[in-house]
From Swiss-Prot:
It comes from the Bacteria. Thiocarboxylated by MoeZ. A covalent CysO-cysteine adduct is formed by the action of CysM. The structure of the adduct seems to be first a S-(glycyl)-cysteinate which leads to a N-(glycyl)-cysteinate after a S->N acyl shift. The gene is cysO. This is Sulfur carrier protein CysO. Belongs to the sulfur carrier protein CysO family. One of its GO terms (cellular component) is cytosol.
Length: 93
């Protein structure tokens, strides 16, 4: 399945400055693997190394505006033409 992935500014150095990229996969996990295959190092910014198979807690990912934390996480199904949005959490004081 081909999807469009919106890349936040903080991750654009991994995609050569591109705001959005194409990726493929039938689950979110497969899409992230495809991103890593094409944009080395990007998955390290998304995945929690202390919890294999889990996203960093400060990374929010949406598939068609639905938060994947409530729709299956990395197992979230992806359909052709879906949009994936990556949003890093922002904190301040």
């Amino acid at each position: 399945m081909n999807v469009t992935v919106s890349i936040p500014t903080i991750l654009r150095p991994h995609t050569g400055g591109q705001k959005s990229v194409s990726a493929s996969g039938d689950t979110l996990g497969a899409v992230i693997s495809d991103l890593e295959a094409n944009y080395s190092g990007i998955s390290e910014r998304l995945m929690d190394p202390s919890s294999p198979g889990k996203l960093h807690r400060f990374v929010n990912i949406y598939v068609n505006d639905e938060d994947v934390r409530f729709s299956g996480g990395l197992a979230t199904a992806i359909a052709d033409g879906d949009s994936v949005t990556i949003l890093p959490a922002v904190a301040g004081g």
